């Protein structure tokens, strides 16, 4: 418990530190998508909701979201089926849709830095991530202080054919799983749609807008700005390294 209490204090200081950064004044018209639970800050269970009014069980995910191949990339782009538009998953989406379910100290910090309401500036996602670290420490302390061992270490089961779907919140955003098993309990099919791929189209959209705005600047600054824009989404493809190759043709 003392180690967790120290971690909570350090996490709170981290929020204050990240909130002091000088962020670019950028706003994007995001559609936020996240898991939601009325009684807790959703992480492992709940319904999939959006800032545009969507509210569905995880089993209906594929009825409302689609992955599409685009000519310029081998990465699939996730979009909303009804509009074909991009959407955002991750810490900004979770805080926008679930700030009321935060633990007391995390909720107070969100309110103090304007993240108790939707934030459309992707650069401030680092503050949202820091607030979620505070949330995690508060959750961990509660679990440790009130833990009661379960009657059994796992649920007993008998193999049979079936199909199931579920969604959880990974640090980077909504993570969708869909599995089918045969009568012997062996995997017949599996489909996983991770948060990085769901944000891929939105990342490219942001890059396009940024590049248009910064074209008058020099090539080095443009490349650095594009890298920063990608890292706002913490995609696993970048590992937060200098990876982006920018090819610029000027007329």
Where on the chain are the PLM-derived regions?
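Active-site bordering "gate/hinge" segments
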Residues: 1-172, 194-251
């Amino acid at each position: 418990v003392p180690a967790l209490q120290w971690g909570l204090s350090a996490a709170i200081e981290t929020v204050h530190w990240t909130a002091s950064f000088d962020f670019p004044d950028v706003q994007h018209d995001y559609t936020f998508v996240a898991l939601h639970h009325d009684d807790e800050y959703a992480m492992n269970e709940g319904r999939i909701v959006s800032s545009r009014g969507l509210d569905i069980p995880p089993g209906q995910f594929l009825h409302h979201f689609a992955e599409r191949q685009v000519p310029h990339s081998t990465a699939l782009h996730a979009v909303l089926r009804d509009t074909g538009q991009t959407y955002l998953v991750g810490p900004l989406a979770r805080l926008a849709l679930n700030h009321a379910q935060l633990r007391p100290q995390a909720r107070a910090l969100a309110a103090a830095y304007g993240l108790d309401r939707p934030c459309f500036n992707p650069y401030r996602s680092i503050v949202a991530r820091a607030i979620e670290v505070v949330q995690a420490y508060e959750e961990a302390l509660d679990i440790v202080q009130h833990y009661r061992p379960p009657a059994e270490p796992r649920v007993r089961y008998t193999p049979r054919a079936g199909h199931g779907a579920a969604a959880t919140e990974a640090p980077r955003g909504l993570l969708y799983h869909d599995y089918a098993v045969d009568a012997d309990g062996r995997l017949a099919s599996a489909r996983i749609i991770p948060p990085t791929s769901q944000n891929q189209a939105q990342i490219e959209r942001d890059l396009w807008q940024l590049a248009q705005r910064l074209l008058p600047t020099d090539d080095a600054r443009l490349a650095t700005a594009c890298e920063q824009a990608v890292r706002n989404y913490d995609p696993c493809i970048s590992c937060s390294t200098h990876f982006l190759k920018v090819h610029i043709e000027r007329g």
